[in-house]
Amino acid sequence: SQFKKIPNKIKLINCVGGGSSAYGFWSEFIDYNKKQIELIGVEAGGPKKSKLHAAPLSKNAKIGILHGAASYLCQNKEGQINDTESISAGLDYPGVSPIHCFLKDTKRARYTYATDEDALNAYQLVTKHENLNPSLEPSHAFAEAIKIAPRLSKDTIIIVNSCGDAKKDRDILRERLGK
């Protein structure tokens, strides 16, 4: 309602672990043309120096069964669930909701990942320049926004769902950033 009409180019960026906050954020926009409203999900890429991650969609995992549902999973060749690693407890999960598998397979949403280091850098930038205190989950989404913003036209609007407060991440932030 602020714009009186939907702008022509919008990027809706959300972190994706299990996927409920992303789908809730995107659900009103699913039927819009993807050239007008792009849905971008950002998974936990884990530490840069580790092979472990929690990014089954963006790291081309295979379909498997977890909790009775078929979805892309971090798994080994025998179908056993792999360990995952992420600075963000809320994103440290080996699977994703089947709705995100559908959105990926139909190319309605694009999925990527941010490393722990990317998320920490984004957290610091957002905290300093926007006076927000995002949790580590949306810091992954902010990392993607920071990465793509310089390449976008000036009429493109980026909206990041900041779906959590850093109070719960206080100990991790103190350990990693000395704050």
Where are these regions (language model features)?
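Active-site/ligand-binding loops adjacent to catalytic centers
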Residues: Q2-I6, D31-Q36, G41-L132, E175-K179
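Glycine-rich phosphate-binding loop signature in dinucleotide/nucleotide-binding domains
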Residues: F3-N8, L152-K154
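Short glycine/serine/threonine-rich phosphate/pyrophosphate-binding segments
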Residues: C15-W26, K49-K51, P138-A145, K167-R170
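A short, small-residue-rich loop immediately preceding and capping a beta-strand
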Residues: N8-S21, L39, T156-S162
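Glycine/aspartate-rich loop-and-adjacent alpha/beta segment that forms the canonical ThDP
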Residues: V160-K179
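C-terminal structured "cap/appendage" subdomains that terminate the fold
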Residues: T127-N161
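Phosphate/ATP-binding catalytic cores across multiple sugar-kinase/actin-like superfamilies
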Residues: S1-F3, K147-I148
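Active-site nucleophile and cofactor-binding loops and adjacent substrate-binding regions
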Residues: I13-G18, E43, Y113-T115, L132-H140, ...
